[in-house]
Amino acid sequence: MKLTELCLKNFRNYSNLKLNFKKPIILFFGANAQGKTNLLEAIYYLATGKSHRAQKEKELIRWETSGFYLKGELEKEQAQYTLEIITNYQNGKNKNLKVNNLSQTNTRNFLKTMNVVIFSPEDLMLVKGTPDNRRRFIDQEITQVDPSYDFYLKNYFKALRQRNKLLKTYQDKNTLAQHLPPWNQQLVHYGSKIILKREEVIHKIRLLARLIYRKITNQTENLELDYSPSLEFEDCKFREQLSGEKLAHKFLNTLNENLQSDIEKRTTSIGPHRDDLIFKINNKDARQFGSQGQQRTTVLALKMAELEMIKGEKGEFPILLLDDVLSELDDNRKKHLLNLTEGRVQTFVTSTSMEDFNGDVDIKAKSQVFRIDNGEAVKLNAGNQE
């Protein structure tokens, strides 16, 4: 799939911008805080309906305006699509999603149109960062291939907030026994779906990332990726054979068993919101024992595995967004990433300098280059790419 046109109005620091893309690699370069990442954010938002960095949608609206407009022209192997997002906060929140000029009442119909994989400097902390970062990574990946997963997440966390509110309000076990069951049922229903989907997708990524990691390290190192749910299972084989019904039964029983502990802690101690991913390199915990180079190779392998998995699920590669990460990769890792994408994956790259590409004239020849300066984009020809 290829994005051939991008329009922004009152989005971040852009008042009105229209860009056309004709080459497989699009480079946005310029000084910091000029709006390079905002362009990738706009593309990501068109694909997912959310920002990868803003907590509140209002943060995306240009100063002293009441809403923003995004449009993308998308070419896929079987069809062409016009995607539009119109927001207005003048009289409360108003958000309209359109595909080919038709408003979408079902958000999932919009989200299944375009797929993206984003790789940013924050991702380099995936291995040694917090479990929350790793959960967010896998949840974003799953939503790309199964938009209904986002529905499960929203309903799960809605039930979780209500359950935690009750745990903070009441300390009497008998009183809680009357109020908790409806929210326990919601947690179990949606939480079981989340756990099963995470296990399914992590299994696919595990196999792909292992092969890619071996290739990057010239067959000298092995990467293992394990799903670590907060629910305790007897062994891995038992977990893999779990049906939704058995999992739901175990989840509910564990919630009831942990009730006294949850009352004391005033929070829910088990569930998908406590899950984690474990990375091992040559059977050692990469978080504790992996070098910085090994950890970066792990993240690179994961991102490349994302591309391949979405290709397998959707039939074509997603769009790749590289947000100021090439300067963080050595020549070997950069080469593997660009070789994988070359000729197959439309790639948008941000950088503060064209020096990131000085060793690769071929990439420059295949690229469209835009200099970004204070919310303005100037297209450069080959002679101006300095």
UniProtKB/Swiss-Prot annotation:
One of its GO terms (cellular component) is cytoplasm. ATP binds at G30, A31, N32, A33, Q34, G35, K36, T37. It is found in: Cytoplasm. It comes from the Bacteria. Keywords: ATP-binding, Cytoplasm, DNA damage, DNA repair, DNA replication, DNA-binding, Nucleotide-binding, SOS response. The keyword ATP-binding applies. Belongs to the RecF family. PANTHER family: DNA REPLICATION AND REPAIR PROTEIN RECF. This is DNA replication and repair protein RecF. It comes from Natranaerobius thermophilus (strain ATCC BAA-1301 / DSM 18059 / JW/NM-WN-LF).
